[in-house]
Amino acid sequence: FSPIDRYNDNHTQETYEDREWENVYRSTHGVNCTGSCSWKDGIVTWEGQELNYPTTGPDMPDFEPRGASYSWYLYSANRGVLWSMWQEELQNNESPLDAWKSSWQEVNELIAASNVYTVKTYGPDRVAGFSPIPAMSMVSYASGARTPDAHFFTEVRVVSVSPDFAESTKLCDLWLAPKQGTDAAMALAMGHVMLREFHLDNPSDYFLNYCRQYTDFPFLVTLSKQKGDQFVADRAADLVDALGQENNPEWKPVLWNENTNDFATPHGTMGSRGKWNLEQRLEDEETGEKLSVLGIEDEIGTVRLQLADGSTALVTTVYDLTMANYGLERGLGGQEPKDFNDDVPFTPAWQEKITGVPRELIIQIAREFADNADKTHGRAVLNLVLLVGAQGVNGGGWAHYVGQEKLRPAEGWQTIAMAKHMNSTSYFYNHSSQWRYETVTAQELLSPMADKYQHHGDYNVLAARMGWLPSAPQLGTNPLRQAGMSPVDYTVKFAAEQPENGKNHPRNLFVWRSNLLGSSGKGHEYMLKYLLGTENGIQGKQGGVKPEEVEWKLSSTCLYSDIVLPTATWYEKDDMNTSDMHPFIHPLSAAVDPAWESKSDWDIFTSLSKKFSEVCVGHLGKETDVVTLPIQHDSAAELAQPLDVKDWKGECEPIPGKTMPQIHVVERDYPATYERFTSIGPLMEKGIAWNTQSEMDLLRAWAALSEFTGRDHTHLALNKEDEKFRDIQAQPRTVITSPAFTGSEKQSFYLDHDMMKDFGESLLVYRPPIDTRKSRPEVEGKEITLNYLTPHNKGGPIVWISETDARDLGIEDNDWIEVFNSNGALTARVPAGMTMMYHAQERGGIHNSVTRPTHMIGGYAQLAYGFNYYGTVGSNRDEFVVVRNINWLDGEGNDQVQESVK
């Protein structure tokens, strides 16, 4: 390379020196960032960006990743520190065993013996493994810089929405700073403005046509009267029996056909099992999908019709419901706002009191956002994007940074991956006993018209029993010991019902590609106390037991592990990477051999499976196991529970795959574990039309999918059948796009599941931050309670508070302070010469997150569990904490080392 590197758009970057290399390998940082590295004499010499990505279209800049560097991990002194310590200890003890370092062979045998004992004594599902984000290195799973976005920052108007002046804010045109946890109110007010001005006052044809074709706005919803004159929106598909539908009538929502002035059900909804509906057709004719019943109504905003049983019902459209939900004045009377200055829910004036953002700014940004989308046809939060037709349009759409990254080539990848998959959020919530510390009951979050379970833990159990979510351990007994018994005899007792029974506790836990205790587990101190039984910093009261006071120290998963195995980094193994952030499949290439004694994850588990197969002989042979599987998304089973939520414990019969999980009897040949681990089995021959004598025939599969959906999809996979791993090493390839199916087969504004209605979330609503009230411990001295926002910009062990709060507390810049609540505590300071520590590495319980019962819904069209798709998540959330000054640490020689007890 010359001293000046030239990149896309003809800009350059000085490199200051010539570089020499022997080979160039394409790899990545391993998370979202993409790039390449080169090596010389077996050493990675430098890292730089690659530019030969496929084009993203003529109206978008070419992809230009400026990814993060990883070589500092590769050659970190930490990788050799244990080796150095062992060598030093070896000089004193002479014996390598006394020097506490083991060999791969010994460790494999120890782990294998432990697994055999656990499987034999407690059951196979008491052995667990945890690894996050399969898409970031999918082969390793099966065995942070966001600077790329800066390339698209030019020539666009960027608005930052952040309670604090974040790093990204300084690059934006406008900064909206809502109070923590109130951004939903701001977004709803923007939606109010858009609907008022671009749907009602001056309707945009583009917006209305988009909503008609690509959203569930035209579908009809029944209204039932409850508690006096109050009406409650009910299921969207309760009318279909009157239309003579026979096949899955409960899954075929109804709309008003303007062409015939009658009710109709389009093909392509979930009841049609995959038929495409975006062409707005009935079986044999075009539909004119009416957005609103205004103008044809029998009563205010509704139409009354007669059902097949002779009764009558009031119906309206999802569009009309949404208008009412946003508080739009449409001449129907009632307490509707006259303009944006009325203090009525969801108006700009209403949100101003909640968020602190001036109403004028909300009106301005909403108008500019919608006007731009109207003029450019979508090149512009999720509701806002749909209202202006900006989803699925190049240059528009909704992008997010947190969440689950999509593993794109799942069909082929699953043939070598997966044991019994578990949703980790519920798993760690149950086994770390976080349900013990809930201060807000489910009843307090429910709609006043709902009467369901009282506790968050109850929803986890309900979801496991009904087959909504996977559960591990599955059953309250070891299925290997129940040979000869019918699975029905012992599968009605789920382990989730008694998570603290010693027999239902996880025994062996493998963790790879993750700092589970520091970040991924969500609930650090609870995991230390209940999952591991070690020292912890929980300060909340539980059952009257006062938590212990502990010495604060840095925590990580390795520090609490019995065995630590050295693994290869992203530059030392071959793998693949996909992301929501870009449409490419990117390789990770082995530029150098694994350093020290490390091995790739795949090689580690291969050697473990080989030793396990040897050790289990005489203890485990061919055994009969029972596996429960949740009702899966994108399968016929997702139509299993169309109506009420009924628990088979007292409300209906237990029917596997219908009212409870699917139950499968599986033969485990434990001595053949290694042979099976290193082979591709017969499952690749199954599917809708796969031909895998040598490899999967992609075009054949897509031809079958085209016949299934009624649309030609083969062009999406053309020229893909010959692509190999070496091809993406030369240049990343674009992924194959495919349709996703929902209940209405459109993007949904309205969700009619019973649990969504119970929690009042069938339509978008604003929920203020939850006040946990008495959850904090008692303190003495001057204090202030703040609404603490979990930092998202990856800061270190420092805390920012306002100047006003600091003055009230007597805190100055660079002081030691203590931040604590019932989940734990942390201390923070920024002394001179201190380096920054990235988030998720420090101990202190800052990653204690809640989940939502509505994420547990299953067996209901798109609301059905699927791997890497849908399930409970540990959400980023607001938290109330106490901050107090601890300046007694200064002047006592504690600037660098904090005493454990004061």
From Swiss-Prot:
Induction / repression: Induced by anaerobiosis, there is no significant expression in an aerobic environment. Expression is further induced in the presence of nitrate or nitrite.
PROSITE patterns per UniProt: MOLYBDOPTERIN_PROK_2
One CC-aspect GO term: plasma membrane
Catalyzed chemical reaction(s): nitrate + a quinol = a quinone + nitrite + H2O
Record's cofactor remark: Binds 1 [4Fe-4S] cluster per subunit.
Gene Ontology biological process terms, A to Z: cellular respiration; nitrate assimilation
Ligand binding ([4Fe-4S] cluster): 29, 33, 37
Major enzyme class: oxidoreductase
Keywords: 4Fe-4S, Cell membrane, Cytoplasm, Electron transport, Iron, Iron-sulfur, Membrane, Metal-binding, Molybdenum, Nitrate assimilation, Oxidoreductase, Transport
Record-level Gene Ontology MF annotations: 4 iron, 4 sulfur cluster binding; metal ion binding; molybdopterin cofactor binding; nitrate reductase (quinone) activity
Subcellular location, principal: membrane
Cofactor: [4Fe-4S] cluster; Mo-bis(molybdopterin guanine dinucleotide)
Role this protein plays: The nitrate reductase enzyme complex allows Bradyrhizobium sp. USDA 3045 to use nitrate as an electron acceptor during anaerobic growth. The alpha chain is the actual site of nitrate reduction.
PANTHER family linked: RESPIRATORY NITRATE REDUCTASE, RESPIRATORY NITRATE REDUCTASE 2 ALPHA CHAIN
Family named by the database record: Belongs to the prokaryotic molybdopterin-containing oxidoreductase family.
Subunit-level organization: Heterotrimer composed of an alpha, a beta and a gamma chain. Alpha and beta are catalytic chains; gamma chains are involved in binding the enzyme complex to the cytoplasmic membrane.
Protein name in the entry: Respiratory nitrate reductase alpha chain
Gene of this entry: narG
